Amino acid sequence: MLTTEEMELLLPEMTLIAGIIFAILIPNLGDSTLRIPLTRTRIPIFIGGTRFKSTSDPRVPARIAIFALFVAFIYSFLEIEGASGEVGGVIEITSFTRMMSFVFYGALLLSAIATTYRMPARTSARAPRENDSESLTEALISALMDNRRQVDFHILLMMVGLGMGLMAMASNLFFMFVAIELAGLAAYVLVAFHKEEEVGGEAGAKYFIVGSVASATGIYGMSLVYLWSGDLDFDALATSWAAMDGLDPFAVIGVGLMLVAFGFKVSAAPFHLAAPDAYAGASSPVAGVLATASKAMGFVAIFRVLIQVTMPEEGEALWFILLAIIAVITMTWGNLAALTSDNPKRMLAYSSVAHAGYMLAAVAAVGSGLGDTSTTELVLVAIVFHLTILVLFKLGAFLVLAMLETEGRSHRLEDLHGLAQRDPLIAGSMFIFMLALAGVPPLSGFLSKLLMINGIVNISAGTGSTSADAIVPWAESVDPVFWLAMAIVLNSALSLFYYLRIGLVMFFEAPENEKPLRKSLHLRNTILVLTILTVFFGLGPGAEYLLDLVEGAVSDL
């Protein structure tokens, strides 16, 4: 039984649980009554019967989800500074956990808002009649299906948030995996949610199969770690790892298998193969969650296992070389694949793979053991800062595609042609999001990449020969960590080609459809706010404030 203090610590998660319960109950409230046995008296039970008009409104589930996620988002933000507590021996609340739940709930809140336009609830929807045209009949059936699925979608969205929030707070490896699977199972269904579309069902099947194999591999690795240590608490595992004499095969293989599961979550090569299909088949708001919140969840797991458990106090980590190689392959493969993609959602999926490579390179630099405490913290701050602001411009780009999806578009590059003529503000926002993803100053995407590169260079500082009189001898003498920074720089330059291509087709190509975009007032305003924040957190007091917030959170990692 949770105490009042523990319930207060878990208020965001308790709010989501309440939201799930209300989303199930409220739409089913009606005038049903129950007769008391052996009497003629009937008492109202309110579940079933003819549903009340106010609670049967198909917009109710979305309102419940948006309200619950908003409360969780705001409370997480308010608790970033000073959050501290423990619940049940498997949950630990710190500034870091609240920082990450702030990221998770923010991404899910934006997705919920966008879904009100991507899958709108129509109160005027009716059943088709015999004299209706074929096109009208299809439209009416589609509207009724959207109404029918409102509860399912928003319950799943809140379940994803609940799993992610609990995962961030996990102080036990088993509990962390349970929370990851709670979020993952709901995400599999969300990817395949529009199963009436061919790409939706196929994407969901691929994502589920690959994700299930990755999860099974990770859980098997966890069992090997338990056989080795006899405990799954992170602090106990860290103590056992530090005291390990030599390399225990159970421990090493177990950690390696768990990294397969985490690699799938962050879309690292070669575990990224299902990601492009999943992003392309899912609705744009859901794809945005996969590219931001799901990726952040995977990196939290990587931090727990690689940084908190297996990172030695001195010297190189066991996984340094392997992770560095995976990072370079991931960023290069992602950018090369994005160059050849003509589907905007697949392009953003490969872009997400590349960004995973950038952050894995930073984690690998920490594993080199060359940095002191301050430089290590600098790199971790850069990663968490990047995960945070990625919600602004990566999810923002998917929200722009969500506006096109309301017209049945967004699956071809041609759908973006002439967007500046149809809606200059939205086209301008999309272009800013692309520049931020590429890392162009003075946007927040540039600052996060600069911090990662600066941190990696600081870690490798002093490893090159000062007596070298040419570039080649110096390059041979410098530590390989330095080349991770160079890989990020070169890949960022490569990515400019496909990000700028989006801008070119929006501003210089003729539109296939010259009608203005649909109003979508709240979605439009959300996109514009994300655009402003993308610039605001790239320089000046905005960047300083967010960096201070992230730095305080990382110090609690």
Task: Give the label of every model feature segment.
Residues 1-557:
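Alpha-helical transmembrane segments of multi-pass membrane proteins predominantly involved
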